[in-house]
Amino acid sequence: MKALEVDNAQNIRTAFFISDGTAITAETLGRAILSQFASVPFETRVLPYVDNLERAEDAVVQINTAYQRDGLLPLVFDTIVSPEIREKINSAHSCNLDMYEGLIGRVAEETGVEPDGHSGHAHDNVDSETYKERIDAVHFALDNDDGARTRHYHAADIILIGVSRSGKTPTSLYLALQFGIRAANYPLTEEDLNDNQLPKALREHKHKLFGLIIDTDRLVKIRQERRAGSRYSSYQQCQQEQRAIQGIYTSQGIPSLDVSEMSVEEIATRILQMTGLKRRIG
């Protein structure tokens, strides 16, 4: 289909993650695919619980509106089971990437069994204990974010450390949400780094520590978005902190990972691989 002639100088393309459930699967797989096209600017939207024709029609309106605005066919990643709802979504002006249809067809061909075709079966089979593990892990990550409540570190599976704005919080939450890992995180301050040793709160939990490293240029850019023109976001300060923290990682024997060019999904997966931590869910 020919693109509309609109003012979209940056060629931003909209990507939708749509599901009749939480949309976590559609979003996770979709973002993994989009990450392979780093040069393309995407605006993403998540539409969960599109489980009836009325909601599907609303999704179609949003997709068509994005097409009218961008002049480019939106990419639609969906995990919708119902053929009727899927057909309605497919009627939109979009490039539809159905994540179930092709896979279910292959499984049916291999097993010789036709799929039920009912939405929600995956959710019916979810173990309530798995749900509890996920929620407990998320609560733990939130309660133990940014050095809060260090008295609970005995219950942590892992404690992420690093300088301010190095990705500790999003990684902790992703580990909790996707894998049920109880992840705390602790920022090493300038005072900690000047002492060239671990803070007292971390010493007895040294075996749980994992360090994040971020490129100085990347760190400057992130901090400038928060406090432009400050000493905190200056190149000299960021470089000094990075050198100091890498020295601590080395002297204390703390495993670490350079996360400068990684997505949070990649960071979390690499951490599990490097530490041998076992996921509690998934």
Curated annotation (Swiss-Prot):
**Keyword Nucleotide-binding appears in the UniProt entry:** yes
Superkingdom to which the source organism belongs: Bacteria
Write down the Pfam families for this protein, in alphabetical order: Kinase-PPPase
Give the top-level enzyme category.
Answer: transferase
Q: Which reaction does it catalyse?
A: [pyruvate, water dikinase] + ADP = [pyruvate, water dikinase]-phosphate + AMP + H(+); [pyruvate, water dikinase]-phosphate + phosphate + H(+) = [pyruvate, water dikinase] + diphosphate
List, alphabetically, the InterPro entries matched: Kinase-pyrophosphorylase, PSRP
Q: Which residues bind ADP?
A: G162, V163, S164, R165, S166, G167, K168, T169
Q: Does the keyword Secreted apply?
A: no
What EC number(s) does this enzyme carry? 2.7.11.33, 2.7.4.28
**GO MF annotation list:** ADP binding; ATP binding; phosphotransferase activity, phosphate group as acceptor; protein serine/threonine kinase activity
This protein's UniProt keywords: Kinase, Nucleotide-binding, Serine/threonine-protein kinase, Transferase
HAMAP family (UniProt xref): PSRP
Family per similarity comment: Belongs to the pyruvate, phosphate/water dikinase regulatory protein family. PSRP subfamily.
What this chain does, per the record? Bifunctional serine/threonine kinase and phosphorylase involved in the regulation of the phosphoenolpyruvate synthase (PEPS) by catalyzing its phosphorylation/dephosphorylation.
The name this protein carries in UniProt is Putative phosphoenolpyruvate synthase regulatory protein
Q: Tell me the classification of the organism that encodes this protein.
A: Bacteria, Pseudomonadati, Pseudomonadota, Gammaproteobacteria, Moraxellales
